[in-house]
Amino acid sequence: MSEDQHKCQYIDPENHLCPNEATDDGLCFWHSLNVDKSGSDIKDKLEHYAQHGGFLRGLKLQHCELDDIDLVNHGHKTGYDLSYCDFYRASLRDAHLFNANLNNASLMKTDLRDANLNCTSLLNANLLGIKLSGCKIENIDFGKNIFQEELAKLAIEKKHYSSAHDYYVQSEEIYRDLRKHSESEGLFNYAGAFIKKELTMRRMQQPKYSAKRIVSKGIDLFCGYGEEPMRIVGFSILLIFICAILYSVTGLNYHGDFYIFDINASFKDNINWFFSCLYYSIVTFTTLGYGDFTPIGVSRAIAAFEAFTGSFTIALFVVVFVKKMTR
């Protein structure tokens, strides 16, 4: 038998090879699913293995009792690389995983209560059913999208809409759990981002052109589900400028005289007229109504729409801003 055949045959999706000796099934103790790892000494074995430079990627640790395990790479800037590890239903209560790399790991239904996950990387990790009560999650890198969300997008590309719906339901559940835990830990910046993603996942479960999905998308664009007050400011500025342009071409009455954009007038006169319309648009949006300009004809409909939208937008901005600042 060649030397390579004595080696563990595990190779991860990034082509990292395990250098350990293989057991009867061609895999080492840590990568084999046929080896019993349910003993109480598994925690000490894993700590010793990690501290002595063991290959930690892709370990099969389903159902293992790893409470209070110390997997902090002391004295090094980078933590242990636990990429692609499978912790399905493992118990990691009070575990120390500071700065660990858990990218692409499966933490499905893992018990991480009171564990320390500060500064860990969880890119593309499966977090479905994870237990986080008391877990420290500051400065975690969750990535732009979670694992199930990426699967949902891939399913849509392949036109597997039923599977995509299931993945979006799972994504909503995960974001809800992360949001609730962030709120309980006082991490309100995280909570704000997670509520936005949670509601986005809920929207994606609706039929593509349904009224609920369209309204939800509009709310997202308008104020980021209440988490983006500056979007309201941007919308307000855009609306004021659009209405100002419309006023300039539909005309306004000023002290009994009717004014409108004139292509034959000088550039200076038209610019002055536009700024007058901009002033009127601001006054109308804020519902001040000084009375120096009055709308005529089509301008009345534009002014009515802008005044209604302005009063609603200002009130919404106050609510969203106060909510954001008082967290």
PLM features: residue spans?
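Tandem repeat scaffolds
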Residues: 2-25, 32-194
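Membrane-proximal alpha-helical anchors
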Residues: 34, 179-183, 200, 204-205, ...
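Coil-to-alpha-helix initiation sites in intrinsically disordered, low-complexity, charged segments
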Residues: 145, 150-152, 203-217, 269-276, ...
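Extended, hydrophilic extramembrane loops/domains of integral membrane proteins
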Residues: 188-206
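Short amphipathic alpha-helical coupling elements at transmembrane boundaries
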Residues: 193-196, 220, 303
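Transmembrane alpha-helical segments and their cytosolic interface motifs
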Residues: 208-252
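Outer-pore turret/helix-boundary of cation channels
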Residues: 236-277
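Pore domain of cation channels
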Residues: 265, 269-327
